[in-house]
Amino acid sequence: MKETEVEDMDTNRKDGKIKKKEKIVNMKNEEVKSTTKSTLADSDEDYSIITLCTKCLSKKLEDNKNRIILDSKAFKDNRLKGRCSVSSNEDPLDNKLNLSPYFDRSQIIQEIILMNNDELSDVYEIDRYKLGKGSYGNVVKAVSKRTGQQRAIKIIEKKKIHNIERLKREILIMKQMDHPNIIKLYEVYEDNEKLYLVLELCDGGELFDKIVKYGSFSEYEAYKIMKQIFSALYYCHSKNIMHRDLKPENILYVDNTEDSPIQIIDWGFASKCMNNHNLKSVVGTPYYIAPEILRGKYDKRCDIWSSGVIMYILLCGYPPFNGKNNDEILKKVEKGEFVFDSNYWARVSDDAKDLICQCLNYNYKERIDVEQVLKHRWFKKFKSNNLIINKTLNKTLIEKFKEFHKLCKIKKLAVTCIAYQLNEKDIGKLKKTFEAFDHNGDGVLTISEIFQCLKVNDNEFDRELYFLLKQLDTDGNGLIDYTEFLAACLDHSIFQQDVICRNAFNVFDLDGDGVITKDELFKILSFSAVQVSFSKEIIENLIKEVDSNNDGFIDYDEFYKMMTGVKE
């Protein structure tokens, strides 16, 4: 067995309770054979090959000596570029196509994450106090010099990167995420020596620390945690993304309040795998790893196993598969046998035990999936404790939807960019409202889910409400993402802040010359268009909506007046 210490952790147990963090070992199989059942090793070498879905192997990404991430082919090909097909000799604005009423605002968010040419030191004041330490570098706290918002920055030393492909995949996966319980990646910076990932700040500590502090949780407290974990998994699995290293150390509390939400972090082992496809690389952490991973053939239900282990620990304070060392732990995982044999389990309901058993089903093909988990009777009995949408909130939200519907397309995009950058304090109760609307827990809203909560059984009113909700669905797929929902519900006082507006303006001003041109607007809007692009006439009309001095551009003063509602 080859051990690779990924984080500064050690092992020490007393009376069956976890007392300190265990040493993490990564798994690798050189040639993935059925005989390598308990082999742990460093998964950095050739990671791009062994971690890809066995039916979805793709070409390796290209490297660059200095800007290995942001200038690599995979990221250049993924920048804003418009979806219509235009030859290099043509003016893209002369390529007239029918206008679609839909454009995907969430797609813009995914792209602006990697569109940063500033120096990190020009944008952030770095606090040298370390929030965490990993094999590649440190995580520190930082404050935006422009907005005052606090962030966490993961500083990665390039010389310590053994597998560039894994890091690229981590970033590409993270920038697709838009869920209340998945940590946000805001920006990526890079210089010759380091890579900087600007992340949502979560300073409430690890779930692991809470387990050490309290020992075990009541069923209701465990329910609140597991509901958030499974909702995040539902969202990921629907995108054919698996985390593969779920554990209490990778679950953070946003703050120190009693009802602080949690965020799932560390997507370094995450991978894509299509339905009915299997992966074969062996990665994970001994206590939480699924037995089928050790056998070298598994799918996204490996995350369900890990979640079942977490739920088990929450309810009793110790792991279902324990041992003096990693070898002993893995042998027990391979057998998949566990019991509810202590006094702790006497007070735990049969429903909770049944759900754990279904999550820890040894045969992963028969294991419960995340949709079935959230329909389990254990979850249903706590559902009545969720936020109840009252009539006052109904009226407020509907008014917000009306206001949002009246906004021009540019402002809708700008508001969406602003919504993505907000922290928990700015979002307020909207997060709980989103979760209350999300009946099936998949991390996105359907028009039907919102309509059922807000309708008043008045035909005329309900028709108007349904129409407004259709407008929130900007890409026409019937789903409303978390950031799209926040953007439609935000208090407009947020837009009065100059620094907030300036940041939104910079998203559109691609070359930083102080004005938004037709070409820049075309690049942004055509990228977010669904199936078709925008004609030259449409782009010109959008500019005219904001261009008060008719010079053909949108300067910052015009943009600010649009955002704040100030009229000439």
UniProtKB/Swiss-Prot annotation:
Ca(2+) 3 binds at residues 509, 511, 513, 520. Ca(2+) 4 binds at residues 547, 549, 551, 558. Its EC number is 2.7.11.1. Ca(2+) 2 binds at residues 473, 475, 477, 484. A motif (J domain EF-hand interaction motif) lies at residues 409-418. The active site is at 245 (proton acceptor). It is a peripheral membrane protein. Belongs to the protein kinase superfamily. Ser/Thr protein kinase family. CDPK subfamily. This is Calcium-dependent protein kinase 5. It comes from Plasmodium falciparum (isolate 3D7). The lineage of its organism: Eukaryota, Sar, Alveolata, Apicomplexa, Aconoidasida.
